[in-house]
Regions:
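Sensory modules in modular signal-transduction proteins
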Residues: 9-45
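PAS-family sensory/regulatory modules and their coupling/dimerization elements
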Residues: 58-113
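Short alpha-helical segment of the dimerization/phosphotransfer core of two-component systems
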Residues: 167-172
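Conserved micro-motifs of the catalytic ATP-binding
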Residues: 187-192, 222, 226-229
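Short helix-loop "hinge" at the ATP-lid/N-box region of the Bergerat-fold HATPase_c
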Residues: 245-246
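Short conserved segment of the HATPase_c
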Residues: 278-290
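Conserved glycine-rich
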Residues: 319-320
Length: 343
């Protein structure tokens, strides 16, 4: 039995740290120890990341990053970021704790999720800025022309410019409203809504909002279809999907909304148009923020590039599934599966 003297804390701390290393075997976090520049221990997670035969390797071969190795071999330890340890270019943080003169305890933390979130945030800000800057530049250009007395121009030209300014201002307003809507939805995405909502009623009321001559049909295999949900958000989903069918489908319609209650406790809601359809390579990305299959057509139709992203977030908040099916020349069907309310 080993006796530790608490009058000399260094050996005690070292022994406790070494004993703790054995507990790391069952952790999901990759961890290893280095003695005299060689890997002396690696838990299962570290072996899965760096290789099954990592024990006994020179740390310079195991880690393959000069900056990280320098931290590992330093007298003070510390942290270093490393990429390329795993397939797919994941980013890792190496945390080095000095156990003794020649021994180190190393923990590795996957930063991929943090990096991905940061990159998505940066992309989102850049895209939002671009989408706002484009109409804003047009507004400034036309306003400056109108204010320039030397430019002249008759009343018809002035009216044309003012209509363009109004159109671009409406584009910015729509974008800001969608950005705020998306922000509100994400803020409460973990709150499961519990109000009783009849989707048949909501579908018929929403279809009645469109008065531009587009034929919107609502067909249901039941008189009512109640789910637990947020009525306003569900109406927003249907409004967005119907509006897409109206804008990108065949001129004048029809846009067909079907509601089918299944025996397995789900409600299938599908919105189908008879437009030109969408190429298959675009389908997986349609719910990404600001992604457009046809940029010029979308902007001409007044789209913000956020509508389907909003739809996806709302459906997921309601514990449902959202899907888009389309073929060029065969129209597009956007569908969602929502759990029916249990009585």
């Amino acid at each position: 039995m080993t006796t530790l003297s608490l009058c000399n804390p260094a050996p005690y701390e070292r022994a406790m740290a070494l004993e703790g290393v054995q507990l790391l075997e069952h952790l999901r976090t990759p961890a290893l120890t280095v003695s005299n520049g060689q890997v002396s221990f690696a838990n299962a997670a570290a072996k899965a990341l760096l290789g099954a035969h990592i024990a006994g390797q020179d740390v310079r071969i195991a880690i393959r990053d000069p900056d990280a190795v320098a931290v590992i071999m330093s007298d003070t330890g510390g942290t270093a970021n490393v990429s390329g340890l795993s397939v797919g270019g994941s980013e890792w943080e190496i945390d080095v704790f000095v156990l003794g003169n020649d021994e180190r305890l190393i923990s590795l933390y996957d930063l991929s999720v943090q990096v991905s979130v940061a990159r998505a945030h940066a992309d989102f800000v850049a895209n939002a800025s671009h989408e706002l800057r484009t109409p804003l530049a047009a507004v400034f250009g036309y306003v400056e022309t109108l204010l320039d007395t030397r430019a002249g121009g008759d009343e018809a030209t002035r009216e044309k410019f003012l209509k363009t300014i109004r159109h671009e201002a409406q584009r910015m307003q729509a974008l800001v409203e969608d950005l705020m809507s998306l922000s509100r939805i994400e803020a409460i995405k973990h709150e499961v809504p519990s109000d009783t909502v009849d989707m048949v009623v909501v579908a018929r009321e929403t279809a009645g909002e469109f008065r531009d001559g587009t034929e919107i049909r609502v067909e249901a295999n039941c008189d009512s279809a109640e789910i637990s949900g947020d009525r306003g958000q569900l109406a927003q989903v249907l409004r967005n999907l119907m509006d897409n069918g109206r804008k990108y489908g065949k001129a004048g319609g029809p846009v067909t909304v079907t509601l089918e209650a299944t025996a397995t406790g789900w409600l299938l809601v599908a919105v189908r148009d008879e437009g030109p359809g969408i190429a298959p390579e675009h389908l997986p990305r349609l719910t990404e923020r600001f992604y457009r299959a046809d940029t010029s057509r979308s902007r001409a139709a007044g789209g913000t590039g956020l509508g389907l992203s909003i739809v996806k977030h709302i459906v997921e908040r309601h514990r449902g599934r959202f899907d888009i099916a389309s073929r060029p020349g065969k129209g597009t069907t956007a569908s969602m599966m929502l759990p029916l309310r249990k009585n």
